[in-house]
């Protein structure tokens, strides 16, 4: 290699370059981290530097496998379990319908409620007269 020309000149006006400080050698924490990474690399435990797309694809594959296992478990359900699920769904539907009816009745205008009360009292009077 060729010698730099600033070594030959003894010009005091020039600023001579100084050797840069190596951060690995100066910091104890950095040295420990570097040593640990080298040991892990030798053992084959290096952190996986996979691209983001590859990580997403692996996650999707795992999710698909889990989903397939759940579906297979559902397919293996007995007739009793299937019937119980159907009944539970019917009960939930009935409860929802009752709630909707109650909400409709509560939200109905006052004159509709009064009309219903008058109709009921009229029917009760008619039944009382017949008996």
Curated annotation (Swiss-Prot):
Induction (free text): Is not up-regulated in the hippocampus by acute social defeat stress or glucocorticoids stimulation.
UniProt keyword terms in alphabetical order: Acetylation, Coiled coil
Coiled-coil segments: 61-112
Post-translational modification N6-acetyllysine, affected residues: 50
GO biological process: sensory perception of sound
Pfam annotation, one family: DUF1151
Modified residues (N-acetylalanine): 2
Protein family according to the UniProt entry: Belongs to the FAM107 family.
Tissue spec. comment: Expressed in the hippocampus and hypothalamus. Expressed in the pontine nuclei and reticulotegmental nucleus. Expressed in Purkinje cell and nuclear layers of the cerebelum. Expressed in the choroid plexus. Expressed in hippocampal granule neurons of the dente gyrus.
InterPro entries: FAM107
Gene, per the UniProt record: Fam107b
Protein name: Protein FAM107B
Ranges of Basic and acidic residues composition bias in the record: 52-79
Renumbered residue ranges of the record's region Disordered: 39-79
Keyword Acetylation: yes
The keyword Metal-binding appears for this protein: no
């Amino acid at each position: 290699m060729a010698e730099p020309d600033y070594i030959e000149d003894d010009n005091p006006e020039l600023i001579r370059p100084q050797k840069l400080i190596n951060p690995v050698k100066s910091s104890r924490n950095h040295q420990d981290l570097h040593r640990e990474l080298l040991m892990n690399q030798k053992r084959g435990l290096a952190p996986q530097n996979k691209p983001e797309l590859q990580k997403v694809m692996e996650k999707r594959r795992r999710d698909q496998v889990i989903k397939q296992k759940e579906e297979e478990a559902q397919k293996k359900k007995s007739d009793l379990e299937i019937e119980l699920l159907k009944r539970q769904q019917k009960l939930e539907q009935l409860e929802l319908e009752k709630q909707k009816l109650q909400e409709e009745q509560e939200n109905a205008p006052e004159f509709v409620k009064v009309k219903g009360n008058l109709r009921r009292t009229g029917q009760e009077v008619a039944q009382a007269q017949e008996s």
